Amino acid sequence: MISSDPEAVSASAYREAMAQLASAVHLVTTDGPGGRAGLTATSVCSVSDGPPTLLVCLNRNSSAYPAFLRNGVLCINTLTAAHEGLATDFAGRVPQAERFAGPDWGRLQTGAPVLAGALVAFDCRIVDRHEVGTHDVLICAVEALAEISGAESLLYAGRHYRVLPRPDSESD
């Protein structure tokens, strides 16, 4: 069905369509006066490289949401294939208080938790916020980066985790 009428697209049809898109998987973390919190997200996107800016969409009904707003900082930790269990834990299978118990966590500039071994970590300050439907679009200035090389990326598509192998360096 093709329709340009926004009322003709149900929430369930939209969610089903979005489930077909492959997305990188991230742990979005924060720490500060609002407490330490984290969640799994796939709605992350580059905005600009001058200055380095990205966006992340967070559900305002998430138990972690108030901490992000109060702290004003976050780290987007892009996951490798080895982190599938963490992605599930941070998606709500484990209570907020227990999510940081497992792996090693560090800090960069903002103080938000940085996952050791993440494919890349974007340490950010929230500089703007837009309410759209059930979510907030957070515009984030990237203040520091941490990255590793050679790891396979974790993707989410069709409601399942998938692995994107690294390109063979000889075929580049």
UniProtKB/Swiss-Prot annotation:
Keywords: Flavoprotein, FMN, NAD, Oxidoreductase. It catalyses: FMNH2 + NAD(+) = FMN + NADH + 2 H(+). This is FMN reductase (NADH) RutF 2. Catalyzes the reduction of FMN to FMNH2 which is used to reduce pyrimidine by RutA via the Rut pathway. Coiled coil: none annotated. GO terms for biological process: nitrogen utilization; uracil catabolic process. GO terms for molecular function: FMN binding; FMN reductase (NADH) activity; FMN reductase [NAD(P)H] activity; riboflavin reductase (NADPH) activity. Its EC number is 1.5.1.42. It comes from the Bacteria. Belongs to the non-flavoprotein flavin reductase family. RutF subfamily. Pfam families: Flavin_Reduct (PF01613).
